[in-house]
Amino acid sequence: MMTLKVCPSLLLLFLVHSVWTRTVRQVYNELDPEHWSHYTFECPQECFCPPSFPNALYCDNKGLKEIPAIPARIWYLYLQNNLIETISEKPFVNATHLRWINLNKNKITNNGIESGVLSKLKRLLYLFLEDNELEEVPAPLPVGLEQLRLARNKISRIPEGVFSNLENLTMLDLHQNNLLDSALQSDTFQGLNSLMQLNIAKNSLKKMPLSIPANTLQLFLDNNSIEVIPENYFSAIPKVTFLRLNYNKLSDDGIPPNGFNVSSILDLQLSHNQLTKIPPINAHLEHLHLDHNRIKSVNGTQICPVSIAVAEDYGLYGNIPRLRYLRLDGNEIQPPIPLDIMICFQLLQAVVI
């Protein structure tokens, strides 16, 4: 493997797992200090209540089998890494201000979630239920949710209309579950008008999912069995910026002539597929990952999104391709890098071959 660095550093466009929602500190700073004078500072004996963070309750890593009674002042509840099997209404009777619940790494099943208990948490913004025993997306959910994390469960079903009222949801993480194509219907994601990040990686999909919300910016579909990109698929998600399709079964025949020639896509990851040639790309693309495919040669004249003549004289035309990072290792390509690649992509900072 050879890396050619054309510039001293590679600027990353954005963090892979970032979504643009309020942080805990931002929400915490909204509080009026006098707010706490209305509450007593009781603390469940199994948990820790930091004096400097009075609206947080830490009950993680305690071997708990059930959720303790939550004091009324609590906004942030940490219950991860326990043995909890059920979510009942009783512990939350006074917890009307909850914004954040972390229940990752427990033993919660769908049958263990009392009907309606989650939807009654009307101020909840963040719900973490990763690494549990869920077989379907729990319903109903709080209408104000901004992030829903359900990774590494056993989810194979998504109830009809479960997301229809979640207009504020910006991030939905369903990666590493048991989802088949049949679980994702044309109306599955209906209502998710604010969604920006959708993660369905590490499932059992053979097709691109139907009806992705139009405002989606980051779409993660790694580690599925997807073979085909439908014609004009990305016209329905015109804002998609970051697209991951690593570890699928994409071949040259499964990609339409201009399947990835999409001006919004800035980071395209197609590693570990079955491609023998580089698909056409858009001049706006900045990062392209094509490592571990079956590519034998690279023709810069063919893959250049503008004519080589224009690229050579980009100062005159002002339409230089923006590609900065190109990864081609794990293919059958031998150095050196063709000169026409360097002529076309004059902003390249690194090429891995």
UniProtKB/Swiss-Prot annotation:
<comment type="similarity">
    <text>Belongs to the small leucine-rich proteoglycan (SLRP) family. SLRP class II subfamily.</text>
</comment>
<keyword id="KW-0677">Repeat</keyword>
<feature type="repeat" description="LRR 4">
    <location>
        <begin position="144"/>
        <end position="165"/>
    </location>
</feature>
<keyword id="KW-0732">Signal</keyword>
<dbReference type="InterPro" id="IPR003591">
    <property type="entry name" value="Leu-rich_rpt_typical-subtyp"/>
</dbReference>
<feature type="repeat" description="LRR 7">
    <location>
        <begin position="215"/>
        <end position="236"/>
    </location>
</feature>
<comment type="function">
    <text>Plays an important role in generating and maintaining a transparent matrix within the corneal stroma.</text>
</comment>
<feature type="domain" description="LRRNT">
    <location>
        <begin position="34"/>
        <end position="72"/>
    </location>
</feature>
<dbReference type="InterPro" id="IPR000372">
    <property type="entry name" value="LRRNT"/>
</dbReference>
<dbReference type="Pfam" id="PF13516">
    <property type="entry name" value="LRR_6"/>
</dbReference>
<dbReference type="InterPro" id="IPR032675">
    <property type="entry name" value="LRR_dom_sf"/>
</dbReference>
<feature type="repeat" description="LRR 10">
    <location>
        <begin position="284"/>
        <end position="305"/>
    </location>
</feature>
<feature type="repeat" description="LRR 3">
    <location>
        <begin position="123"/>
        <end position="143"/>
    </location>
</feature>
<feature type="disulfide bond">
    <location>
        <begin position="304"/>
        <end position="344"/>
    </location>
</feature>
<keyword id="KW-1015">Disulfide bond</keyword>
<dbReference type="InterPro" id="IPR050333">
    <property type="entry name" value="SLRP"/>
</dbReference>
<feature type="glycosylation site" description="N-linked (GlcNAc...) asparagine">
    <location>
        <position position="299"/>
    </location>
</feature>
<feature type="glycosylation site" description="N-linked (GlcNAc...) (keratan sulfate) asparagine">
    <location>
        <position position="261"/>
    </location>
</feature>
<dbReference type="Pfam" id="PF13855">
    <property type="entry name" value="LRR_8"/>
</dbReference>
<protein>
    <recommendedName>
        <fullName>Keratocan</fullName>
    </recommendedName>
</protein>
<feature type="glycosylation site" description="N-linked (GlcNAc...) (keratan sulfate) asparagine">
    <location>
        <position position="223"/>
    </location>
</feature>
<feature type="glycosylation site" description="N-linked (GlcNAc...) asparagine">
    <location>
        <position position="168"/>
    </location>
</feature>
<feature type="repeat" description="LRR 8">
    <location>
        <begin position="239"/>
        <end position="262"/>
    </location>
</feature>
<dbReference type="InterPro" id="IPR001611">
    <property type="entry name" value="Leu-rich_rpt"/>
</dbReference>
<feature type="signal peptide">
    <location>
        <begin position="1"/>
        <end position="21"/>
    </location>
</feature>
<feature type="disulfide bond">
    <location>
        <begin position="47"/>
        <end position="59"/>
    </location>
</feature>
<feature type="repeat" description="LRR 5">
    <location>
        <begin position="168"/>
        <end position="188"/>
    </location>
</feature>
<feature type="disulfide bond">
    <location>
        <begin position="43"/>
        <end position="49"/>
    </location>
</feature>
<keyword id="KW-0433">Leucine-rich repeat</keyword>
<keyword id="KW-0325">Glycoprotein</keyword>
<keyword id="KW-0654">Proteoglycan</keyword>
<feature type="repeat" description="LRR 6">
    <location>
        <begin position="194"/>
        <end position="214"/>
    </location>
</feature>
<feature type="repeat" description="LRR 9">
    <location>
        <begin position="264"/>
        <end position="283"/>
    </location>
</feature>
<feature type="repeat" description="LRR 2">
    <location>
        <begin position="97"/>
        <end position="118"/>
    </location>
</feature>
<feature type="repeat" description="LRR 1">
    <location>
        <begin position="73"/>
        <end position="94"/>
    </location>
</feature>
<keyword id="KW-0272">Extracellular matrix</keyword>
<dbReference type="Pfam" id="PF01462">
    <property type="entry name" value="LRRNT"/>
</dbReference>
<feature type="glycosylation site" description="N-linked (GlcNAc...) (keratan sulfate) asparagine">
    <location>
        <position position="94"/>
    </location>
</feature>
<dbReference type="GO" id="GO:0005615">
    <property type="term" value="C:extracellular space"/>
</dbReference>
<keyword id="KW-0964">Secreted</keyword>
